[in-house]
């Protein structure tokens, strides 16, 4: 089969490799569509990033070559011994978390906190390939109302749904989103689906501001032209937002989240910063603001599928381009790195 293999930083090759049968408890899936995630870009630019630098305690994989890709939908084509919950022809998505099931956190159902955590597409082969083999427990069925393309958004939407859960958002709350990339746009829609009042978006890129307006934002603010804090204060009778999501993960974005939120507000940091971020302690303390973090998902995949199935979350406008697997690097990864302002999500068809 054809697969895109990460060998090292800056080195992803599309090659012909063997497509093996599923083992006990495993399911072989024909990959239909796979989205390119920001973490895939990190692996190309500065990896290994999430890819293990030493043998993973569960998969024993280390470095390359490894097949990237974890935002995907597919169709079951073969079953390993003992598989009872799926049949050939089932349309599925995969929760890519790899966890031990034995540690303190796994016993609590908090798999994202597993002390041996790994992820399909990094610590095990992923979905930038014609076929993939995955454990039965990780599969979820897609209803007929969710297309293959929509299915490729289940994983990032689960990230968004988890972030809303972590924020403890109250129904009717005013919400601000800092950064309208793929996750920010999905967090915005997940908030609305969960009962938010008005949702405001702070985003410098024109194309992403347009998508924000088209998918539910009450107001969209360009921080290069307007003071976001003052603008949101005007829109909320001086109170500013009850809740903000930092979906960027850098110092300016966090500073903005602090300025656009009111007293006793919650700031949920979803974006990942590779550098330390300074915190305005006095302001947070004096206004009794809470800062929380959201780094993945646990049991949010069914909710994400439901949101897509009944069209409470719409993803069509987030699709910037569709490409074949052979063009993964030159038409997918490199454009996202070099011209990110023109793209939101690029889908890959193996």
Task: Pin down the residues of each PLM region.
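Short glycine-centered segments of the SAM/dcSAM-binding site in methyltransferase folds
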Residues: 91, 174, 265-266, 290
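Adenosine-nucleotide cofactor-binding segment
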Residues: 174-180, 192-256
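C-terminal hydrophobic helical "lid"/dimerization subdomain
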Residues: 243, 251, 255-259, 298, ...
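N-terminal Rossmann-fold NAD(P) dinucleotide-binding loop
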Residues: 184-185
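Rossmann-fold NAD(P)-binding glycine/threonine-rich loop
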Residues: 271-288
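NAD(P)H dinucleotide-binding glycine-rich loop of Rossmann-like/cofactor-binding domains
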Residues: 56-70, 98-178
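Glycine-rich beta-strand-centered segment in the early N-terminal region that forms part
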Residues: 20-34, 49-104, 143-145
């Amino acid at each position: 089969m054809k697969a895109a293999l990460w060998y090292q930083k800056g080195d992803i090759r599309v090659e012909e490799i063997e497509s093996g049968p599923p083992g006990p408890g495993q399911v072989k899936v024909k990959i239909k569509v796979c989205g390119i995630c920001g973490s895939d870009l990190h692996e190309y630019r500065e990896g290994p990033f999430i890819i293990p630098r030493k043998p993973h305690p569960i998969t024993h994989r280390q470095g390359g070559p490894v097949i990237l890709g974890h935002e995907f939908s597919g169709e079951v084509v073969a079953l390993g011994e003992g598989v009872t919950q799926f049949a050939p022809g089932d349309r599925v998505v995969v929760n890519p978390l790899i966890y031990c099931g034995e540690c303190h956190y796994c016993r609590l159902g908090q798999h994202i906190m597993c002390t041996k955590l790994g992820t399909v597409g990094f610590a095990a082969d992923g979905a930038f390939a014609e076929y993939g083999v995955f454990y039965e427990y990780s599969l979820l069925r897609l209803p007929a109302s969710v297309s293959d393309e929509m299915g490729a958004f289940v994983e990032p939407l689960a990230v968004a749904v988890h972030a809303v859960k972590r924020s403890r958002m109250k129904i009717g709350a005013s919400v601000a989103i800092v950064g309208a990339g793929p996750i920010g746009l999905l967090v915005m829609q997940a908030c609305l689906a969960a009962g938010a009042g008005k949702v405001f978006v702070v985003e410098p890129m024109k194309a992403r501001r347009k998508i924000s307006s088209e998918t539910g934002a009450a107001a969209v603010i360009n921080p290069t032209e307007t003071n976001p804090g003052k603008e949101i204060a005007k829109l909320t009778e001086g109170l500013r937002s009850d809740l903000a999501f930092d979906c960027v993960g850098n110092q300016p974005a966090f500073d903005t989240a602090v300025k656009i939120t009111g007293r006793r507000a919650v700031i949920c940091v979803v974006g990942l910063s590779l550098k330390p971020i300074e915190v305005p302690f006095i302001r947070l303390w004096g206004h009794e603001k809470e800062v929380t973090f959201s780094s993945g998902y646990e049991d949010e995949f069914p909710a994400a599928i439901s949101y897509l199935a009944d069209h409470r979350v719409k993803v069509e406008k987030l699709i910037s381009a569709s490409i074949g697997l052979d063009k993964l690097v030159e038409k997918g990864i490199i454009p996202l790195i070099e011209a990110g302002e023109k793209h939101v999500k690029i889908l890959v068809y193996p």
